[in-house]
Regions:
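Short, structured helix-loop element that forms part of the nucleotide-activated donor/catalytic region
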Residues: 41-49, 225-249
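N-terminal strand-loop element at the rim of the active site
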Residues: 6-61, 144, 151, 232
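Short His-centered aromatic/hydrophobic patch
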Residues: 80-88, 106
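A short, active-site helix/loop in glycosyltransferases that binds the activated sugar's phosphate group
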Residues: 133-158, 165-169
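Aromatic "clamp/platform" in nucleotide-sugar-dependent glycosyltransferases that forms part
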Residues: 256, 275
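Conserved acidic donor-binding segment of nucleotide-sugar-dependent glycosyltransferases
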Residues: 309-318, 327-332
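Short hydrophobic beta-strand element within catalytic cores of glycosyltransferases
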Residues: 37, 292-295
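A conserved mid-protein helix/loop that constitutes part of the nucleotide-sugar donor-binding site
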Residues: 14-25, 191, 195-214, 318
Length: 366
């Protein structure tokens, strides 16, 4: 049995974290899996443990146990996950004098990361200095790989492995959708536009709500659905100031949710307004659920979904309105037909089984 240690920045709700969860679920019992996370409340802890993995938050005891394991099993795979996770994995590797096979995975856009704070810029430059140490570095897109090379990353084995999802989880669940629609008091004939994601400047919720305001005034059958941490209407009062109370009642804020497949089952048009994304797992999940999607033109896989994915320039809320209306004016049957074609493409290119096989091949070949 091969010991596999994931060192992750966190295991809370997020794209990189959900990929880790899906990857661990998919790996076979050839691997004895241990997950160490640095920050957060550990949202996915119970789900990860249910797979048989051991899960620890970083502390002196878990650190000592991991060091002891590396000394005892020097062929352990040491897989970093996100910047801080990569640093932790490297720290363990150096502390044990090179024991373990060190790998990194980079999930974020460097350009976006360095502009968040000086601390993030320093972390990026520091990881660039250490980037020769891993046996290989995985990036989630070719664009992210090129970005990090421009910031000084150097390694003989830099590979792109796309994020994958368990496509079976996102099959449309009409029964669950009906229950949610009923609980939210949304008419069955409504067109539902929605998004999923925490409130963060990169997500650009201002553009989302600017366009929502225009759309909801123009289309009385439109309802807006938002599932994400720290999103509340008071933060966007300027964008929504012209709406009546009836129109505001058609905006539904659900907060942070774990039942994303069920929520996507009732969304007709999924919108991504992010100004920077390394991959956007939420968009792939929406496509896997058969949603028609509108996104900023920063996504590298738009060519795979010519009908189901329409793009607009970042910040351009008026273009976003036109893109959404393209799908509003379609019949439900037309949207469903487009959605079914998108599902087949996701299954072909972005399944978790393909991602898992790519990682297993990497760990065994380098």
């Amino acid at each position: 049995m091969t010991h596999l240690i994931f060192c992750s920045t966190s295991i809370d709700c997020g794209g990189a974290e959900s990929l880790l969860l899906n990857l661990v679920k998919e790996l076979d019992n050839k691997y004895k899996i241990i997950i160490i996370y640095i920050i957060g409340k550990g949202t996915y802890k119970s789900e990860l443990k249910s797979t048989g993995a051991e899960v620890f938050k970083l502390n002196p005891i878990s650190l000592f146990r991991t060091i002891k394991l590396l000394y005892k099993n020097p062929d352990t795979i040491l897989q970093g996950w996100m910047y801080h996770g990569n640093l932790l994995a490297t720290f363990l590797y150096l502390l044990t004098l090179g024991r373990g096979k060190l790998f990194w995975t980079v999930h974020h856009s460097a350009e976006n990361y360095v502009h968040e704070s000086l601390k993030h810029f320093l972390i990026l430059k520091f990881t660039a200095l250490l980037s020769r140490l891993p046996k290989a570095i995985v990036f989630v897109s070719e664009f992210i790989k090129k970005e990090h090379i421009s910031y000084g990353y150097k390694n003989n084995h830099m590979q792109v492995i796309y994020n994958g999802i368990d496509t079976s989880l996102f099959k449309r669940n009409e029964e669950a959708a009906k229950k949610l629609i009923y609980s939210l008091n949304i008419p069955s004939e409504a067109v539902i536009m929605g998004t999923v994601g925490r409130n963060h400047p990169v997500k650009d919720y201002r553009t989302f709500f600017r366009s929502s305001s225009l759309l909801i005034k123009k289309h009385p059958n439109l309802h807006i659905l938002v599932a994400g941490r720290d999103v509340n209407l008071s933060q966007f009062s300027n964008e929504l100031r012209d709406l009546t109370s009836e129109q505001l009642n058609r905006i539904h804020l659900l907060g942070e949710r774990k039942d994303i497949p069920e929520i996507l089952s009732l969304i007709d048009i999924f919108v991504l307004t992010s100004i920077s994304e390394s991959f956007s797992i939420s968009l792939i999940e929406a496509l896997a659920a058969g949603c028609c999607c509108v996104s900023t033109n920063i996504i590298f896989y738009t060519h795979l979904f010519p009908e189901a994915l329409t793009v607009f320039p970042p910040y351009d809320y008026q273009s976003l309105v036109k893109c959404v209306e393209k799908y509003i004016y379609m019949s439900k049957e037309q949207r469903n037909k487009i959605g079914k074609e998108a599902i087949l493409k996701v299954e072909k290119y972005f399944s978790i089984s393909k991602t898992t096989n790519d990682y297993k091949n990497l760990w065994s070949s380098v």
